[in-house]
Amino acid sequence: MQIFVKTLTGKTITLEVESSDTIDNVKAKIQDKEGIPPDQQRLIFAGKQLEDGRTLADYNIQKESTLHLVLRLRGGGKKRKKKTYTKPKKTKHKHRKVKLAVLQFYKVDESGKVQRLRKECPNGECGAGTFMANHFDRHYCGK
C-alpha cells in the first residue's frame, strides 16, 4: 500500500509499505529518501507519536494515510553564564538589640516619681508613647 509523509518543509513523500511493517522500517525508508537519521525522526499520525516497535496496523494506518514527520529536539536550554559582579556586595546594617531599651526614655528621681526624659510627639498621627528624637538644637519626630 502507499502512504504519504509530510515533512516540515511542506514536501510530501510517498512510501510503498505494508500494514505489517514496523515504524522502524518506515523511518529507514524515510532515511533512504530524505537522508534524515531515524533517531532524529518523529512520526505523528492522528495527533499521536508513533513508537518504533509497533506496526502500521497497530495505529490503524491504511492506504493513502498521511504521516507527519518532525525532527526530535536534543538537549535542554542554552547554558547561561554566571554573573560576575564588579563591586563587592554591600554589608547590611546589623540591628543591635539593647536590653531594657525603654529605660532610656524614663528616669526615677529620689522621691520615686517617674519622669520622661524625651518629649512625646504632639502630632495626632503619631499617637501616645511616640517619643521625639533629641537633637542638639531641636526635637524631631520624623514625620
Swiss-Prot record:
Q: Which residues form the Ubiquitin-like domain?
A: 1-76
UniProt source species:
Daucus carota (Wild carrot)
Something else known: Ubiquitin is generally synthesized as a polyubiquitin precursor with tandem head to tail repeats. Often, there are one to three additional amino acids after the last repeat, removed in the mature protein. Alternatively, ubiquitin extension protein is synthesized as a single copy of ubiquitin fused to a ribosomal protein (either eL40 or eS31) or to an ubiquitin-related protein (either RUB1 or RUB2). Following translation, extension protein is cleaved from ubiquitin.
Q: Which PROSITE patterns match?
A: UBIQUITIN_1, UBIQUITIN_2
Q: Where is this cross-link: Glycyl lysine isopeptide (Gly-Lys) (interchain with K-? in acceptor proteins)?
A: G76
- Kindly list the ranges of residues that form C4-type zinc fingers according to the record: 121-143
Q: Which InterPro entries match?
A: Ribosomal_eS31, Ribosomal_eS31_euk-type_sf, Ribosomal_zn-bd, Ubiquitin-like_dom, Ubiquitin-like_domsf, Ubiquitin_CS, Ubiquitin_dom, Ubiquitin_ubiquitin-like
Q: Which family does it belong to?
A: In the N-terminal section; belongs to the ubiquitin family. In the C-terminal section; belongs to the eukaryotic ribosomal protein eS31 family.
Q: What is this protein called?
A: Ubiquitin-ribosomal protein eS31 fusion protein
